[in-house]
Amino acid sequence: MALALCLQVLCSLCGWLSLYISFCHLNKHRSYEWSCRLVTFTHGVLSIGLSAYIGFIDGPWPFTHPGSPNTPLQVHVLCLTLGYFIFDLGWCVYFQSEGALMLAHHTLSILGIIMALVLGESGTEVNAVLFGSELTNPLLQMRWFLRETGHYHSFTGDVVDFLFVALFTGVRIGVGACLLFCEMVSPTPKWFVKAGGVAMYAVSWCFMFSIWRFAWRKSIKKYHAWRSRRSEERQLKHNGHLKIH
Protein backbone atom coordinates (compact mmCIF):
# COMPACT_ATOMS: atom_id res chain seq x y z
CA MET A 1 0.00 0.00 0.00
CA ALA A 2 2.78 2.42 0.95
CA LEU A 3 4.67 1.58 -2.23
CA ALA A 4 1.56 2.20 -4.34
CA LEU A 5 1.08 5.62 -2.71
CA CYS A 6 4.73 6.55 -3.28
CA LEU A 7 4.45 5.53 -6.94
CA GLN A 8 1.32 7.68 -7.37
CA VAL A 9 3.04 10.69 -5.83
CA LEU A 10 6.17 10.11 -7.93
CA CYS A 11 4.08 9.86 -11.11
CA SER A 12 2.29 13.06 -10.13
CA LEU A 13 5.58 14.87 -9.51
CA CYS A 14 6.96 13.70 -12.86
CA GLY A 15 3.73 14.78 -14.56
CA TRP A 16 3.84 18.32 -13.16
CA LEU A 17 7.55 18.60 -13.92
CA SER A 18 6.95 17.44 -17.50
CA LEU A 19 4.15 19.97 -17.88
CA TYR A 20 6.45 22.72 -16.61
CA ILE A 21 9.19 21.73 -19.06
CA SER A 22 6.63 21.71 -21.88
CA PHE A 23 5.45 25.21 -20.95
CA CYS A 24 9.07 26.39 -20.85
CA HIS A 25 9.64 25.11 -24.41
CA LEU A 26 6.38 26.62 -25.65
CA ASN A 27 7.10 29.99 -24.00
CA LYS A 28 10.82 30.44 -24.62
CA HIS A 29 10.38 34.21 -24.82
CA ARG A 30 8.83 34.24 -21.33
CA SER A 31 10.37 33.86 -17.88
CA TYR A 32 10.53 30.61 -15.93
CA GLU A 33 8.02 32.06 -13.51
CA TRP A 34 5.53 32.46 -16.37
CA SER A 35 5.68 28.71 -17.06
CA CYS A 36 5.53 27.84 -13.36
CA ARG A 37 2.43 29.97 -12.89
CA LEU A 38 0.81 28.25 -15.87
CA VAL A 39 1.39 24.96 -14.06
CA THR A 40 -0.03 26.49 -10.87
CA PHE A 41 -3.09 27.75 -12.76
CA THR A 42 -3.62 24.31 -14.31
CA HIS A 43 -3.35 22.59 -10.93
CA GLY A 44 -5.70 25.12 -9.38
CA VAL A 45 -8.45 24.56 -11.95
CA LEU A 46 -8.00 20.78 -11.85
CA SER A 47 -7.93 20.52 -8.06
CA ILE A 48 -10.98 22.78 -7.68
CA GLY A 49 -13.00 20.55 -10.00
CA LEU A 50 -11.86 17.28 -8.42
CA SER A 51 -12.16 18.41 -4.79
CA ALA A 52 -15.58 19.96 -5.48
CA TYR A 53 -16.78 16.68 -6.98
CA ILE A 54 -15.50 14.77 -3.96
CA GLY A 55 -16.98 17.17 -1.42
CA PHE A 56 -20.35 17.91 -3.01
CA ILE A 57 -21.12 14.72 -4.95
CA ASP A 58 -18.96 11.71 -4.09
CA GLY A 59 -18.75 12.43 -0.36
CA PRO A 60 -18.55 12.13 2.52
CA TRP A 61 -19.54 15.63 3.66
CA PRO A 62 -16.59 17.18 5.56
CA PHE A 63 -18.75 19.12 8.03
CA THR A 64 -20.44 15.97 9.34
CA HIS A 65 -17.83 13.25 8.75
CA PRO A 66 -14.39 14.63 9.65
CA GLY A 67 -11.84 11.94 10.35
CA SER A 68 -13.64 9.36 8.21
CA PRO A 69 -11.65 6.74 6.24
CA ASN A 70 -10.21 7.89 2.94
CA THR A 71 -12.03 6.94 -0.25
CA PRO A 72 -10.05 5.75 -3.31
CA LEU A 73 -10.88 8.97 -5.16
CA GLN A 74 -9.67 11.08 -2.24
CA VAL A 75 -6.39 9.15 -2.22
CA HIS A 76 -5.84 9.73 -5.95
CA VAL A 77 -6.54 13.46 -5.67
CA LEU A 78 -4.32 13.84 -2.60
CA CYS A 79 -1.45 12.04 -4.37
CA LEU A 80 -1.94 14.25 -7.43
CA THR A 81 -1.85 17.38 -5.27
CA LEU A 82 1.07 16.18 -3.15
CA GLY A 83 3.18 15.77 -6.27
CA TYR A 84 2.31 19.32 -7.31
CA PHE A 85 3.15 20.85 -3.92
CA ILE A 86 6.50 19.06 -3.86
CA PHE A 87 7.24 20.43 -7.34
CA ASP A 88 6.15 23.97 -6.47
CA LEU A 89 7.97 24.04 -3.13
CA GLY A 90 11.16 22.88 -4.84
CA TRP A 91 10.73 25.54 -7.54
CA CYS A 92 10.13 28.30 -4.98
CA VAL A 93 13.17 27.29 -2.91
CA TYR A 94 15.42 26.99 -5.97
CA PHE A 95 14.43 30.35 -7.47
CA GLN A 96 13.86 32.01 -4.06
CA SER A 97 10.66 33.53 -5.39
CA GLU A 98 8.45 33.36 -2.29
CA GLY A 99 8.59 34.54 1.29
CA ALA A 100 8.48 32.55 4.51
CA LEU A 101 4.67 32.61 4.73
CA MET A 102 4.13 30.93 1.35
CA LEU A 103 6.85 28.38 2.09
CA ALA A 104 5.16 27.64 5.42
CA HIS A 105 1.82 27.20 3.62
CA HIS A 106 3.34 24.74 1.14
CA THR A 107 5.14 22.83 3.91
CA LEU A 108 1.97 22.52 6.00
CA SER A 109 0.03 21.41 2.93
CA ILE A 110 2.58 18.70 2.17
CA LEU A 111 2.65 17.49 5.78
CA GLY A 112 -1.15 17.52 6.01
CA ILE A 113 -1.58 15.46 2.84
CA ILE A 114 1.13 12.98 3.89
CA MET A 115 -0.54 12.66 7.30
CA ALA A 116 -3.93 11.87 5.74
CA LEU A 117 -2.39 9.33 3.35
CA VAL A 118 -0.38 7.58 6.07
CA LEU A 119 -3.29 7.46 8.53
CA GLY A 120 -5.76 6.38 5.87
CA GLU A 121 -8.28 8.83 7.29
CA SER A 122 -9.17 12.55 7.45
CA GLY A 123 -8.93 12.79 3.67
CA THR A 124 -12.43 14.26 3.79
CA GLU A 125 -11.44 17.45 5.59
CA VAL A 126 -8.04 17.67 3.89
CA ASN A 127 -9.85 17.59 0.55
CA ALA A 128 -12.18 20.36 1.79
CA VAL A 129 -9.17 22.45 2.80
CA LEU A 130 -7.70 21.82 -0.65
CA PHE A 131 -10.89 23.12 -2.27
CA GLY A 132 -10.94 26.27 -0.13
CA SER A 133 -7.24 26.93 -0.59
CA GLU A 134 -7.23 26.47 -4.35
CA LEU A 135 -10.52 28.26 -5.06
CA THR A 136 -8.80 31.66 -5.25
CA ASN A 137 -5.58 30.39 -6.83
CA PRO A 138 -6.61 30.82 -10.50
CA LEU A 139 -7.63 34.41 -9.73
CA LEU A 140 -4.26 35.05 -8.12
CA GLN A 141 -2.48 33.73 -11.21
CA MET A 142 -4.76 35.74 -13.53
CA ARG A 143 -3.82 38.86 -11.58
CA TRP A 144 -0.13 38.13 -12.13
CA PHE A 145 -0.60 37.46 -15.85
CA LEU A 146 -2.62 40.67 -16.24
CA ARG A 147 0.14 42.62 -14.56
CA GLU A 148 2.84 41.00 -16.71
CA THR A 149 0.98 41.77 -19.94
CA GLY A 150 0.14 45.34 -18.93
CA HIS A 151 -3.62 44.79 -18.56
CA TYR A 152 -3.87 44.86 -14.77
CA HIS A 153 -4.98 48.50 -14.44
CA SER A 154 -8.29 47.89 -16.16
CA PHE A 155 -11.86 46.85 -15.42
CA THR A 156 -10.81 43.20 -15.75
CA GLY A 157 -8.09 43.69 -13.16
CA ASP A 158 -10.58 45.30 -10.77
CA VAL A 159 -13.02 42.39 -11.21
CA VAL A 160 -10.29 39.82 -10.59
CA ASP A 161 -9.14 41.63 -7.44
CA PHE A 162 -12.70 41.96 -6.13
CA LEU A 163 -13.50 38.28 -6.70
CA PHE A 164 -10.21 37.25 -5.11
CA VAL A 165 -10.77 39.27 -1.94
CA ALA A 166 -14.45 38.28 -1.69
CA LEU A 167 -13.82 34.55 -2.19
CA PHE A 168 -10.81 34.49 0.13
CA THR A 169 -12.75 36.25 2.89
CA GLY A 170 -15.97 34.32 2.44
CA VAL A 171 -14.66 30.83 1.76
CA ARG A 172 -11.19 30.51 3.21
CA ILE A 173 -11.90 32.57 6.34
CA GLY A 174 -15.69 32.27 6.77
CA VAL A 175 -16.38 28.70 5.65
CA GLY A 176 -12.93 27.70 6.89
CA ALA A 177 -13.92 28.74 10.41
CA CYS A 178 -17.02 26.51 10.24
CA LEU A 179 -14.95 23.57 9.00
CA LEU A 180 -12.35 24.08 11.73
CA PHE A 181 -15.10 24.20 14.37
CA CYS A 182 -16.58 20.92 13.12
CA GLU A 183 -13.10 19.40 13.13
CA MET A 184 -12.38 20.51 16.69
CA VAL A 185 -15.67 19.37 18.25
CA SER A 186 -15.66 15.98 16.52
CA PRO A 187 -14.11 13.14 18.57
CA THR A 188 -13.05 11.22 15.46
CA PRO A 189 -10.00 13.09 14.07
CA LYS A 190 -6.63 12.64 15.77
CA TRP A 191 -5.38 15.51 17.92
CA PHE A 192 -2.43 16.24 15.62
CA VAL A 193 -4.82 16.42 12.65
CA LYS A 194 -6.75 19.08 14.56
CA ALA A 195 -3.50 20.89 15.34
CA GLY A 196 -2.66 20.89 11.64
CA GLY A 197 -6.06 22.39 10.89
CA VAL A 198 -5.44 25.19 13.38
CA ALA A 199 -2.02 25.88 11.84
CA MET A 200 -3.45 26.07 8.31
CA TYR A 201 -6.22 28.39 9.43
CA ALA A 202 -3.67 30.62 11.19
CA VAL A 203 -1.69 30.84 7.94
CA SER A 204 -4.91 31.81 6.13
CA TRP A 205 -5.39 34.69 8.58
CA CYS A 206 -1.82 35.86 7.94
CA PHE A 207 -2.63 35.95 4.24
CA MET A 208 -5.93 37.68 5.02
CA PHE A 209 -4.26 40.58 6.82
CA SER A 210 -2.00 41.18 3.82
CA ILE A 211 -4.95 40.96 1.43
CA TRP A 212 -7.05 43.40 3.45
CA ARG A 213 -4.16 45.88 3.57
CA PHE A 214 -3.84 45.61 -0.20
CA ALA A 215 -7.61 46.01 -0.69
CA TRP A 216 -7.69 49.06 1.60
CA ARG A 217 -4.78 50.76 -0.19
CA LYS A 218 -6.31 50.07 -3.60
CA SER A 219 -9.73 51.33 -2.47
CA ILE A 220 -8.23 54.56 -1.12
CA LYS A 221 -6.25 55.03 -4.33
CA LYS A 222 -9.38 54.46 -6.44
CA TYR A 223 -11.34 56.89 -4.26
CA HIS A 224 -8.74 59.65 -4.59
CA ALA A 225 -8.57 59.09 -8.36
CA TRP A 226 -12.37 59.38 -8.54
CA ARG A 227 -12.32 62.58 -6.45
CA SER A 228 -9.63 64.01 -8.72
CA ARG A 229 -11.64 63.23 -11.86
CA ARG A 230 -14.79 64.75 -10.36
CA SER A 231 -12.88 67.89 -9.43
CA GLU A 232 -11.46 68.19 -12.95
CA GLU A 233 -14.91 67.67 -14.49
CA ARG A 234 -16.44 70.37 -12.29
CA GLN A 235 -13.59 72.73 -13.12
CA LEU A 236 -13.96 72.13 -16.86
CA LYS A 237 -17.72 72.61 -16.62
CA HIS A 238 -17.26 75.84 -14.64
CA ASN A 239 -14.69 77.16 -17.13
CA GLY A 240 -17.04 76.33 -19.99
CA HIS A 241 -19.81 78.42 -18.41
CA LEU A 242 -17.38 81.32 -17.96
CA LYS A 243 -16.40 81.24 -21.64
CA ILE A 244 -20.06 81.21 -22.72
CA HIS A 245 -20.83 84.29 -20.61
Curated annotation (Swiss-Prot):
Keywords: Membrane, Transmembrane, Transmembrane helix. One of its GO terms (cellular component) is membrane. It is found in: Membrane. It is a multi-pass membrane protein. The chain crosses the membrane at residues 1-21, 38-58, 75-95, 99-119, 162-182, 191-211. It comes from the Eukaryota. The keyword Cell membrane does not apply. Residues 29-204 form the TLC domain. SMART domains: TLC. InterPro entries: TLC-dom (IPR006634), TLCD5 (IPR042512). PANTHER family: TLC DOMAIN-CONTAINING PROTEIN 5 (PTHR31898:SF1), TRANSMEMBRANE PROTEIN 136 (PTHR31898). Belongs to the TLCD5 family. This is TLC domain-containing protein 5. It comes from Homo sapiens. The lineage of its organism: Eukaryota, Metazoa, Chordata, Craniata, Vertebrata. The gene is TLCD5.
